[in-house]
Amino acid sequence: TCGCQMKEVINEYNVVPLPVTMSEQQGRFYLNSDVPIVVNASQEVKHIASGLSTTLLDIAGLKLKPTDELHENVPSIVFDSIPGMEKEAYKLSVTPQLIKITASAPNGFYYGLQTLYQLLPVDVYCKERARNAEWSVPCVEIEDAPTFRYRGAMLDVCRHFASIDYIKKFIDVLAAHKMNTFHWHLTDDQGWRIEIKKYPKLTEIGSQRSETMVDYFYTHYPFKYDGKPHGGFYTQDEIKEVVAYAQSKYITVIPEIELPGHALAAIASYPELSCTPDSTYEVCKLWGVFDQVFCPTDTFFQFMEGVMDEVVELFPSSYIHIGGDECPKYAWEHCSHCQKLIRELGLENDITPNPVDGRKHTKEEKLQSYIVSRVEKYLNSKGRNIIGWDEILEGGLAPNATVMSWRGVEGGMTAAKAGHDAIMTPNPYAYLDHYQEEPEIAPVTIGGYNTLKKTYSYNPVPADADSLVKQHIIGVQANCWAEYMPTEDNRDYQIFPRLIAISETGWTPMKKKNFTSFCNRMVEDFQRLEAMGVKPCLNFFDVNINTRATQEGVLNVELETFYPGAQIYYTTHGEQPSIHANLYNHPFPLDGTYDLKAAAFVNGKQIGKVTHKQLYKNLISGKKYEIMPEPKGMKGDILGENDILGADTVTLGLTNGKRGNNASSTPWVGISPDNNDKVTFIVDFEKATIRKIRFGTLYNAAGGILPVS
């Protein structure tokens, strides 16, 4: 077979995302070329059913035959349309004599078929003929429908370009996991990736950058570059091809055209779109946020309307994403045209907080709201609505806008309370460019630390949300920003398996979600991903090493693997772990300096790589402390201050037995002293005798991180 064979499947009902109800039954349905497919539904559903016939012919060599009549005592597959079900809902019944998918709309039939595929041998996802597979389905009764109507994933192709083949593979995985939206980030400072025939320079100039910065943003100062041109764009024919491909899998493609910030690629192509049109610009070759933004002149609005005219012809989505994030106001503050426009519009700095978000907004923030509202009005005239990142709340929200909440959950909550739809994509959970395993051993990325477990734990609707908020939080999305993903393998590693966790959050009722169950089902889903050509992060099979303090101040070492039923063996003095090493049963106290190595084993065989961590015991290990001024942002707990390990977790970034490193700033405690004055650290040593105090600091001048003197 072509699927991954190194891991043992836990059970036969490994459906991801988990259905609303699933009742396992006795027996199996056996497939052979005598099995007919009966479709009592529309021509579109017949086309869906033909996909099953084609797949089984190509992969299994089975020639299932379509027919219009169901005959008694003949094992059959039936697609049966009934009225009254939700658009994406379906029922799947499997008995020894009958496989029956019931739905009201083609979307439901398609999702029922995806569940059926997941109950078949994993070989059904292969690209070539399977060998030695038993083509049968375990008997089951399933009733299913999604929790949220919007279940999306965003792919950034501006920082690093992605091929059409990769885009299609990405869509395949979304569809297999019942996600229904592909958010395509097509324009940014580092590249313009969509052909606009009215403005050819956007791709002649804007799609190419001369070189790209290397390593992490703050590693080198001055910055270093690779000296290699990077570029690419999608022709309108290619975009039509992708949109049609996605539609065949019941996925809507939403394009993102960034404005008014993240505009350098467009400004490099047409400098007259900026506040300083006589300046010379280039497509950006480093990462970050830049002052060069669109200037709200008649020229800009004519340009954007021309761009949107072509965009709406290419994308039938009811939504167009207009970005709206990270737009510095410096250029507008120093632009005579912008200041004149601000006066003409009567925009002023707020004296009292805005009633919607409780903030005082500047006149320049209100100018951004004017720009967004004007573009929205134009798109509304074309029958489209806009989505924007949560910054579009600042200065006033456009009348019909949907907010995509990325800087935490507050933006989405604010929008929902104001009666606007919101899509939740908070970076502490849903940003797939963040680390998912220890930064020391992982490929360099932007920062953060979102484990599979943490990503899975997210609930888009807070437990105390009122009915208005519940009504307007319409879904969830995973975001994949590609600054540190120069290859498609890098993308796969960052995206998977965490995207699958987001798929379950979007589909499965929160009360049904269970991380242990998810991990059981993920063992086979890793095989599906491999069969589909995906190369995911395999931290799932490794051991995570954590420390946690008890309320009594004892610092315990905790070892965890996501692989269900695996045994963890460890050593404390640098030896390679084996089944003859220490078997981990429960947390143990850190009572010395440990050169800890651990690995997971199943049936006596190691399944992942060895995890290595040095831990240190000293007089303040596990002790609580106070820091003044209070740390903001970086608090030293790599798992996050609201860690899912439990409410009794004590955040002890400075006394957790771990040393910081240069791989990431996340494990460090970051402090901004008032007036560049002193930092006060208070800890109770109790009765200990102190002979020496040592501390370490992170020094990174390029990042504005300075050592303590």
Stretches with model-predicted labels:
Residues 2-148, 490, 505-528, 532:
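Contiguous, structured surface segment used for ligand recognition
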Residues 6, 17, 21, 38-40, ...:
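Short, compositionally stereotyped local motifs that mark structural "simplifiers"
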Residues 85-319, 335, 374, 378, ...:
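Feature activates predominantly on carbohydrate-active enzymes
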Residues 102, 154, 185, 252, ...:
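Residues within well-ordered beta-strands of beta-sheet-rich folds
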Residues 158, 187-191, 258-262, 325-329, ...:
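Active-site beta-loop-alpha junctions enriched in small/polar residues
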Residues 266-271, 283-285, 290-399, 406-414:
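Active-site neighborhood of glycoside hydrolase catalytic domains
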Residues 386-401, 405-556:
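Flexible, acidic glycine-rich loops studded with aromatic residues
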Residues 659-709:
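Aromatic, loop-rich ligand-recognition surfaces of beta-strand-rich domains
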